[in-house]
């Protein structure tokens, strides 16, 4: 893939953002004429503010982002090879790696310039939010999505691909934001003889790398799902097309349009495997299959006793989140739990303790809770993670030492539904603290009278006295007090 023939590196941006983003515009004029007008306008908005960028930023932020990106690519490749070996993904790894590098470069460069122009990460007018961690919007998703599809020759799948792209870009932006702010709140490395600052910066950069790898993997999954959906349904404007003849016609058209020959050859070879892969199946109306030939009538057989149906095996934590992440969560969680409470540690399998410890990390709960709330897609890997965490919670004794507390920020529409006498619940895991002083701040403070909460502080490594409730736990609103900017609730669990 050659999305941008002369796409600049982070070193180029560090030396001169203005000069190098102008080079991006020039490179587009040398090729990809069909994408010229769109990209020229897109990159012009990036380069408009680039003249002041380097002087405002300095080099350390870009260095940290560059390091996180470099660390993310091996994680991304390993996860792809493990999860998608059945469809020969290794054959197009160079194409996919180039794709995610260029998308990260576009998004990261946009954020860099936006930070200089707006004083906060991503302060640009074309869709990326003005605050760290804000979600990349439809504007940048549309423009970047069109560039990707034009370069690959996959414009036919645009409706399905672009619709899901902002979620992928949001995950990538989250990783870039984590690396960008890696040095916030710590002493400069040269002024900290203990080495603690260096360790904190490195931990944040590694976390950013894992977030970036996850966003890159989401991008590839979206591309594959868009291809499968197009082959099965056709373009949205044409309606749902179900016959095998139409699938064959669409397949031939798609392969004829593909600009990257390596990608086209891979698709031709693995199309049947793609269409049959369970993780790429689409929801909604399914294609109409050819009628099967009639079979000779069989004589009725004597009814036999039904055989018990084996429960399908849940994928391991390593299969769900990758070997590196799973091993780190399992080893860290087990080490902390064995030291803090060996008896409770012995109750949990490695997958269960790894999932619960992983949830207590920023990367864990920020990954799973939005999906449980329906804000991001819930993949089979996420479902496996939830299963291991729930099974681990079920083995632990309930917390019985009193009320727990939670501070959070809720939008007005959610708060308006939390009225005295009505039930309420969160589709995600619900984190609370046994210590009122350790509960997080926000516009809402809750006192929870729980029954099924489990103390997981013995495996977390954080001093938050965390008591965790499973997804969907239901509470009654016993009391509500609106006190200026803070609303206080008393919630009692419904047995």
From Swiss-Prot:
Residues 278-309 are annotated as: Disordered. Its main location: secreted. The keyword Glycosyltransferase applies. It is found in: Secreted; Host cytoplasm. Residues 344-495 are annotated as: ART domain. It holds the Pfam family DUF6861. Keywords: Glycosyltransferase, Host cytoplasm, Nucleotidyltransferase, Secreted, Toxin, Transferase, Virulence. Residues 315-495 form the TR mART core domain. The keyword Plastid does not apply. GO terms for molecular function: NAD+-protein-arginine ADP-ribosyltransferase activity; nucleotidyltransferase activity; toxin activity. SUPFAM superfamilies: ADP-ribosylation. Belongs to the Arg-specific ADP-ribosyltransferase family. The ART domain is toxic when expressed as a protein fragment. Toxic component of a contact-dependent interbacterial competition system (also called effector-immunity systems). Acts by ADP-ribosylating a number of target proteins in target cells; E.coli target proteins include FtsZ, EFTu, RNase E, Fis, YegQ, GuaB and IF2. This is NAD(+)--protein-arginine ADP-ribosyltransferase Tre1.
């Amino acid at each position: 893939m050659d999305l941008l023939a002369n796409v600049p590196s982070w070193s180029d941006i560090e030396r001169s953002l203005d000069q190098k983003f102008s080079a991006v515009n020039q490179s587009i004029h040398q090729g990809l004429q069909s994408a010229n007008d769109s990209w020229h306008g897109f990159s012009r908005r990036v380069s408009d503010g680039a003249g002041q960028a380097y002087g405002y930023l300095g080099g350390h932020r870009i260095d940290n982002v560059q390091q996180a990106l470099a660390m993310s690519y091996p994680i991304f490749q390993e996860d792809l090879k493990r999860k998608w070996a059945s469809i020969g993904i290794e054959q197009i790894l160079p194409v996919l790696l180039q794709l995610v590098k260029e998308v990260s470069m576009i998004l990261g460069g946009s954020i860099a310039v936006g930070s200089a122009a707006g004083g906060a990460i991503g302060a640009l007018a074309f869709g990326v939010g003005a605050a760290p961690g804000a979600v990349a919007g439809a504007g940048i998703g549309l423009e970047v999505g069109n560039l990707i599809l034009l370069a690959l020759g996959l414009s036919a799948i645009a409706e399905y691909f672009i619709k899901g792209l902002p979620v992928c870009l949001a995950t990538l932006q989250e990783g870039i934001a984590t690396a960008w702010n890696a040095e916030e709140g710590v002493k400069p490395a040269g002024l900290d003889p203990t080495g603690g600052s260096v360790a904190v910066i490195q931990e944040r950069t590694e976390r950013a790398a894992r977030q970036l790898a996850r966003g890159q993997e989401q991008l590839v999954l979206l591309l594959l799902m868009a291809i499968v959906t197009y082959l099965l349904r056709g373009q949205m404007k044409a309606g749902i097309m179900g016959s095998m003849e139409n699938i064959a016609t669409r397949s031939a058209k798609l392969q004829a349009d593909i600009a990257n020959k390596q990608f086209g050859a891979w698709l031709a070879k693995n199309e049947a495997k793609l269409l049959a892969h369970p993780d790429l199946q689409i929801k909604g109306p399914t294609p109409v299959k050819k009628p099967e030939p009639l079979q000779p009538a069989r004589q009725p057989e004597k009814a036999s006793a039904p055989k018990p149906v084996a429960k399908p095996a849940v994928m391991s934590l390593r299969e769900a989140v990758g070997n590196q992440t799973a091993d780190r969560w399992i080893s860290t969680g087990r080490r902390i739990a064995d030291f803090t409470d060996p008896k409770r540690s012995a109750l949990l399998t490695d997958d269960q303790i790894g999932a619960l410890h992983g949830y207590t990390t920023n990367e864990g709960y920020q990954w799973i809770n939005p999906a449980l709330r329906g804000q991001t897609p819930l993949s089979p890997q996420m479902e496996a993670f939830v299963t291991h965490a729930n099974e681990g919670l079920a083995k632990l004794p309930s917390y019985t030492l009193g009320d727990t507390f939670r501070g959070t920020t809720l939008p007005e529409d959610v708060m308006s539904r939390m009225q005295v006498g009505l039930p309420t619940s969160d589709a995600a895991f619900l984190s609370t603290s046994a210590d009122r002083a350790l509960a997080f701040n926000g516009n809402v403070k809750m006192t929870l009278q729980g029954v099924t909460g489990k103390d997981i502080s013995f495996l977390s490594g954080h001093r938050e006295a965390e008591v965790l409730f499973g997804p969907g736990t239901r509470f009654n609103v016993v009391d509500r007090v609106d006190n200026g900017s803070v609303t206080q609730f008393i919630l009692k669990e419904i047995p």
